[in-house]
Amino acid sequence: MDCCNEGACTKLDEDILDIPLDDPDANAAAAKIQASFRGHMTRKKIKGGEIDRKTKDAECANSTRGGDLRNGD
């Protein structure tokens, strides 16, 4: 069901639909936005991983497991 076929589109909806997809400037702008978002998500993921790693390190330090795994004990 297309809103423009019903005559219910606003001027903003029509403007959005009129964006040429082969415009090099629009493609460059979209690429920058996407790269920025991917960087944001990667930094967020890495930050979350560091918190998990710190928690695991603390648990390992508090454990009472004996022996040194490097020596095969």
Swiss-Prot record:
Upper classification of the organism: Eukaryota, Metazoa, Chordata, Craniata, Vertebrata
Transferase as UniProt keyword: no
One Pfam family it belongs to: IQ
Segments of skewed composition (Basic and acidic residues): 47-59
Listed InterPro entries: IQ_motif_EF-hand-BS
Region (Disordered): 47-73
UniProt modified residues of type Phosphoserine: S36
Organism of this sequence: Serinus canaria (Island canary)
Residue ranges constituting the IQ domain according to the UniProt record: 26-55
Recorded family membership: Belongs to the neurogranin family.
Matches recorded under Gene3D superfamilies: 1.20.5.190
UniProt xrefs under CDD domains: IQCD
Molecular function terms from GO: calmodulin binding
Full protein name: Neurogranin
Keywords: Calmodulin-binding, Phosphoprotein
Function according to Swiss-Prot or TrEMBL: Acts as a 'third messenger' substrate of protein kinase C-mediated molecular cascades during synaptic development and remodeling. Binds to calmodulin in the absence of calcium.
